[in-house]
Amino acid sequence: MTLNLQTPFPTFGGSTGGWLRAAEVEEKYAITWTSKKEQIFEMPTGGAAIMRNGENLLYLARKEQCLALGTQLRTFKINDYKIYRIFPSGEVQYLHPKDGVFPEKVNPGRTSVNSRGFSIGKNPNPASIKFSGITTYES
């Protein structure tokens, strides 16, 4: 995965409130997405911006801000966003979605974590295992 740093930024009339100053010595995050039209969106740092028609690139100071913006982009039916970490040395690391599929979607190679092989209606009655020494989540 490569990050095109020449991608235009959304039109934003404000500032990030100093969020990106620390990124010069630590790391910053970039989110890219493609929009079918120009539309206004809310910045995670406050204020509003206008996303460009086509590809967009936005630098933010925290990964959580990128994830919040990604959640908002999904309300605009934009599902192709990608999040990168950029180190001060210029090294770029691809972060999200890690294997190309969003975490809540099913992926054939993905193993399920903390899942039960039956529906919630088949759970045992907690009263029947109360003093048996077995916890409810293990039964």
UniProtKB/Swiss-Prot annotation:
Reading the lineage from the top rank, the first entry is: Eukaryota
Gene Ontology terms: biological process: photosynthesis
Protein function: PsaD can form complexes with ferredoxin and ferredoxin-oxidoreductase in photosystem I (PS I) reaction center.
SS bond partners: none
Asked if the keyword Membrane belongs to this entry, the reply reads yes
**What is the recorded membrane topology of this protein?**
Peripheral membrane protein
Q: Name one GO cellular component term.
A: photosystem I reaction center
GTP-binding is among the record's keywords: no
PANTHER family, per database record: PHOTOSYSTEM I REACTION CENTER SUBUNIT II, CHLOROPLASTIC, PHOTOSYSTEM I REACTION CENTER SUBUNIT II-1, CHLOROPLASTIC-RELATED
Q: Which InterPro entries match?
A: PsaD, PsaD_sf
Q: Which UniProt keywords apply?
A: Chloroplast, Membrane, Photosynthesis, Photosystem I, Plastid, Thylakoid
What's the protein called, per UniProt? Answer: Photosystem I reaction center subunit II
Question: Of which family is this protein a member?
Answer: Belongs to the PsaD family.
Q: Where in the cell is it found?
A: Plastid, Chloroplast thylakoid membrane
One Pfam family, short name please?
PsaD
